[in-house]
């Protein structure tokens, strides 16, 4: 009898421990953001003096990969690369091959990758280990998953930038994978946008500001350094394969020297915008900054975002933008074709609330899902980077946006967004739908017809972490 009772108590004990573990995991993954915090301060909306630098818009995915390889090849002393997602697929392997070649040329390489994605997709790759093992390369993972810090699992590094020799950089919304770079790796490619910036060489300006931000996030004690055994046979073989790959790439003649004067245009000012970089709940510093900038618009504001997932404070931000400008237009993926099922489901739930702010929404459908994050203010300012108009970007993740004062760049982007409106369906604040001249009604895939009604219910309790 005692043995039976003892066995029963052990089962209850294990069941209790398992229940505690499940509650711990679920509670950790659903830590709510500082959704009610919307404090204003001079620190949140005061911008540094803009620097007069040269810029180049990078829209095509093949062009985006080529620019990365050209920048890395041009480096003579230092490379800094930070990315949210890094896959060792075709384009990712090209980038690793270029970085290894740079390290072997005595260029110091520092690489910061979001920890969750690195643990899932990167650290087991022998090609990546070959780079990490090199004496001139240093790799850190931002806030990797730890059982003792599961409550911090939602705090991700969403930045994407590449800095060369403290004099030039590329920043935008693209991850380092075939989904965003190159041409032949996947049929599901997204469309996105980067900007290349060439500094003035003064040691100041936006290049220095971005480097300062990187040094802050690089030094966080929640990061973990990643090292590999460079003498392991499989790592040595991977390194040899990368050298062969790089030789083949450079042999095509596509990785050409950069002619900065011919390939860039002069901007009146370039400013790096960011919020808190620590792995914790964040005040919406960047959201407040973007709101203040949008309030300065007087004619037309265009917001490109893959998805719109707002709380009350973010709806208020849109209302404030509408209060200052004649027209505020959001371009987002049509729910029939958007690549993010969670974002599409939430948009269907929140469509009336979005329109009630006074904005109009263009539901865009194209050959590729849009992953672009851009804000155009009148005919002068363009803001490009990684910030989605959602609560995750506002309160949980690290994000970067680049404010560019350049009417020529703005005009090029306006031409692109005007064409997207021609291809889309525009919803006016009163709910009226206006089809563009080139609009073709998208077909809802069969799986979405069944999935979206379910997701619209399921996501409601935790939409702030989507």
Question: Over which residues does each language-model region extend?
Answer:
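Short loop/turn segments at beta-alpha junctions that line or gate ligand-sensing/allosteric surfaces
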Residues: 144
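Extended, Lys/Arg-enriched charged tracts that mediate electrostatic binding to polyanionic substrates
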Residues: 140
């Amino acid at each position: 009898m005692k043995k039976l009772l003892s066995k029963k108590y052990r089962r209850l004990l294990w069941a209790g421990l398992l229940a505690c573990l499940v509650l711990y995991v679920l509670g950790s993954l659903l830590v709510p953001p500082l959704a009610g915090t919307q404090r204003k301060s001079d620190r949140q909306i005061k911008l540094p003096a803009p620097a007069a630098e040269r810029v180049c818009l990078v829209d095509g995915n093949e062009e985006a990969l080529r620019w990365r390889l050209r920048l890395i090849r041009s480096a003579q002393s230092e490379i800094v690369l930070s990315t949210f997602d890094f896959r060792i697929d075709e384009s990712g392997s090209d980038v690793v091959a270029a970085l290894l070649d740079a390290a072997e040329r005595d260029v110091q390489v520092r690489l910061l990758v979001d920890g969750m994605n690195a643990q899932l997709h990167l650290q087991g790759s022998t090609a990546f280990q070959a780079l990490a093992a090199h004496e001139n390369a240093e790799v850190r993972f931002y806030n990797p998953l730890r059982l003792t810090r599961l409550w911090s699992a939602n705090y991700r590094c969403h930045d994407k930038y590449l800095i060369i020799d403290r004099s030039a950089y590329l920043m935008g919304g693209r991850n380092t994978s075939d989904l965003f770079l190159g041409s032949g790796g996947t049929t599901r490619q997204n469309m996105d946008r980067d900007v290349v910036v060439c500094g003035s060489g003064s040691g100041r300006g936006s290049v220095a500001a971005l480097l300062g931000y990187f040094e802050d996030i690089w030094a966080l004690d929640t990061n973990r350094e990643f090292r590999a055994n460079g003498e392991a046979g499989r790592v040595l073989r991977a390194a040899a394969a990368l050298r062969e790959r790089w030789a083949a790439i450079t042999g095509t003649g596509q990785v050409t020297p950069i002619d900065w004067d011919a390939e860039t245009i002069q901007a009146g000012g370039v400013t790096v915008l960011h919020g808190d970089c620590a792995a914790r709940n964040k005040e919406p510093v960047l959201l407040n900054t973007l709101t203040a900038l949008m309030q300065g618009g007087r004619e037309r504001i265009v917001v490109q975002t893959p998805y719109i997932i707002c709380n009350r404070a973010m709806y208020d931000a849109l209302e404030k933008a509408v209060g200052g400008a004649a027209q505020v237009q959001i371009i987002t993926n049509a729910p029939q074709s958007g690549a993010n099922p969670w974002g599409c489901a939430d948009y269907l739930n929140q469509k009336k609330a979005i329109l009630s702010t006074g904005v109009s929404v263009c539901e865009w459908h194209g050959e590729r899902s849009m992953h672009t994050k851009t804000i155009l203010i009148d005919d002068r300012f363009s803001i490009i980077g990684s910030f989605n108009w959602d609560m995750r970007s506002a309160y949980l993740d690290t994000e970067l946006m680049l404010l560019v004062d350049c009417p020529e760049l703005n005009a090029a982007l306006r031409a692109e967004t005007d064409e997207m409106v021609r291809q889309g369906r525009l919803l006016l604040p009163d709910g009226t739908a206006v089809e563009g001249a080139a609009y073709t009604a998208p077909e809802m895939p069969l799986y979405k017809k069944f999935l979206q009604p379910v997701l619209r219910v399921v996501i409601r309790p935790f939409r702030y972490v989507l």
